[in-house]
Each structure stands twice: as structure tokens, then as C-alpha cells.
Amino acid sequence: WLGHAAFRFDTPAGDRIYVDPFLKGNPSCPASELEPERVDAILVTHGHDDHVGDAVALARAFACPVIAQVELRTLLAAEIGSDMTQALNKGGGIDLLSSHVTLTHANHSSSHGGSYTGESC
């Protein structure tokens, strides 16, 4: 746990996956995580700034994929390119590096930059 809703998962295969990478500006984030040394993939659960956080900057710095709900993926693709993003719907799953990820329902609003970004997952 990296504070707030941010998590880093190091898989048994050695992959490093960040979920909701709100690092800078997150008062609970450990100082050692403010400038990650490696990011292999990013998952963003919904469009609020405290969940999207540093996803765009990290994706650019590490050329890693960002997986997000369809509507949010469209907005992120406009910033980092469609080749670095992948859309997934609630209930859908994806093989991500050495792991499998399934989006599940979450009761929460979702917007980014004033735009609706799909259901939270």
C-alpha cells in the first residue's frame, strides 16, 4: 500500500504493477516510491485525480501500458497515445504480463477533467 488508494504489486514472476498511482501529492506515499525505479504496467480504477495520479507521467517515463475503463482509456490515450493504453469493461479480464486482472464493480463516482469516465472498477 502506497497511501490513499495507490498500490504496488510485485508479482512472483518479477513484474511490477501499479494500481491508481497517486504518488506525488499523496501525503501517505513513502518517499521511496515518489520516483519509482521501474514500472511494468499501470491499472487505473476510475478517473478521479487521486486515482489517475501519476499514471500519465509514469507511462511516459517507463513506456508501460495503462489499462483503464473504456471511457477513461479514451481520455488517457489522447495524452499518451492509444498504443500505450488498453480498454477494459467491468467484468472483463485481461492477461497482464504474468498476471490476470478482472475488473469488478465499485460503487463510486468517476470523472476526469470534468468528463465522465465510465463506471468505477
Q: What residue spans do the PLM features occupy?
A:
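Active-site-proximal beta-strand elements of phosphoester/diester hydrolases
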Residues: 1-2, 17-20, 100-106
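Pre-active-site segment of Zn-dependent metallo-hydrolases
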Residues: 8-48, 53-60, 110-118
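Short internal beta-strands
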Residues: 40, 64-71
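Metal-dependent catalytic neighborhoods of phosphoester/phosphodiester hydrolases
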Residues: 53-62, 71, 77-80
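Metallo-beta-lactamase
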Residues: 70-121
